[in-house]
A protein has these predicted regions:
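Hydrophobic ligand-binding cavity/cleft-lining segments
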Residues: 1-42
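Glycine-rich portal/gate segments that line the openings of hydrophobic small-molecule binding cavities
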Residues: 28-29, 38-82, 86, 96-102
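Contiguous, function-dense segments enriched for cysteine-driven chemistry
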Residues: 7, 13-16, 21-24, 53-65, ...
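Beta-strand/loop substructures that line and gate deep hydrophobic ligand-binding cavities in soluble
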Residues: 77-129
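Generic surface-pattern signal
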Residues: 39, 128-131
Length: 131
């Protein structure tokens, strides 16, 4: 099991960045590797389940484990067959204004290492004015 963290800062308000996380229907707008999301929930909450579809044809199932709206933090588990990743996200104020988002990914080392640049690209778009 390996753990890696990536963070990015940008000019959008914390509330905007958080809403982009909190509403699964918006994920494909800022995460370029996500084609669409299937879930019955309009907003993340503990126990919410669904599937994420990538442009590469990969479908992964997910379960939201924890959400703290006040602290703007959430954790979810993503799985594809025997591969499972745990992803922890948070949005904070960036020095000088805007927001900073941080992602901590835990899982098999090769998957975590390969996902890091994709995650960095997505996080940069999350905190950008128009993803």
């Amino acid at each position: 099991m390996a753990t890696r963290t990536v963070s990015r800062a940008g000019p959008v308000a914390q509330e905007t960045a958080w809403e982009r996380y909190a509403r699964p229907a918006l994920w494909s707008q800022w995460a370029p590797h996500i084609r669409r999301v299937e879930t019955d929930a309009g907003r993340i909450a503990p126990g919410v389940r669904g599937r994420v579809f990538s442009y590469a044809g990969v479908r992964v199932r997910f379960t939201v484990e924890r959400v703290d709206e006040e602290q703007r933090r959430w954790t979810w588990r993503v799985g594809l067959g025997p591969l499972v990743l745990r992803l922890g996200h948070e949005v904070t104020a960036a020095p000088g204004g805007g927001s900073r988002t941080r992602l901590t990914v835990s899982g098999p080392l090769p998957v975590v290492v390969l996902y890091r640049p994709v995650a960095a690209w997505a996080l940069k778009r999350l905190v950008a004015p128009a993803p």
